[in-house]
Amino acid sequence: VRSRRQRQMCIRDRPAPEQADLAVLVSRFQSAGVPVKYSWIGRELPDDKGLQLTLFRIAQEAMTNILRYAPTTKRVEVTVSRHAGTAVLTVDNDAAPGSRPMHGSGKGLIGMRERAAVYGGTVDAGPTSTGWRVRAVLRWDEDDEGTSPWQMPL
C-alpha cells in the first residue's frame, strides 16, 4: 500500500497542452493505486489545445483532491460526455464506509471554476450520498472549433 505522498508524486508530472490526455491521467492514478473507471461518451473534443488542457487540468485537480482529502476512497468514476458544443466532465468518488471527509482551502475549486469560465462554463462540487462529485461544463462555438480563448488578443 502506497502512502498518500507517494501516490501524489506518481501523478505530479505536468503535461504540455498537446499531451493533455485524460486516459494517460487516469492510468497514472490507477498506477498509484486509485481504482478509477473512465468513460467518454460522444465525439472527441475539437482541435483546440486550450480547451483540451482546460478539461485535463480540471480532471487533474478533481482527482488530486481525492488523493488529498478522501484518502479512503474505494472507487472513482471519471466521465466525459461531449455533444453539440458542450463537454461535461464528471468526477465522482465513493468513500469507504465510516470515513470522514477532510476539507481544503477551496483554492482548487476556485481555479477549476476560473478555467471553466474561459470556455463559458461552470464547475459545481459537493457531497453525494456516497462521496463527492465535481461536475464541469465547458462550452464552445461548434462553428468555430479552432479558435481558443487562450489564443485571442487581450
Q: Model-found features: residue ranges?
A:
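Glycine-rich nucleotide-binding loop
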Residues: 85-88, 96-97, 128-135
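Conserved phosphate/oxyanion-binding catalytic-loop motifs
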Residues: 62, 112
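Short beta-strand/loop element within the Bergerat-fold HATPase_c
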Residues: 75-85, 90-94
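Glycine-rich/acidic phosphate-handling loop/turn and adjacent ATP-lid/helix
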Residues: 88-109
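Flexible, glycine-/charge-rich segments associated with ATP-binding catalytic modules
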Residues: 117-154
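Short helix-loop "hinge" at the ATP-lid/N-box region of the Bergerat-fold HATPase_c
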Residues: 66-67
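Conserved short strand/loop->alpha-helix "switch" segment adjacent to the catalytic nucleotide/phosphoryl-transfer site
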Residues: 38-59
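Single conserved hydrophobic/aromatic residue that forms the stacking wall/gate
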Residues: 1-7, 11
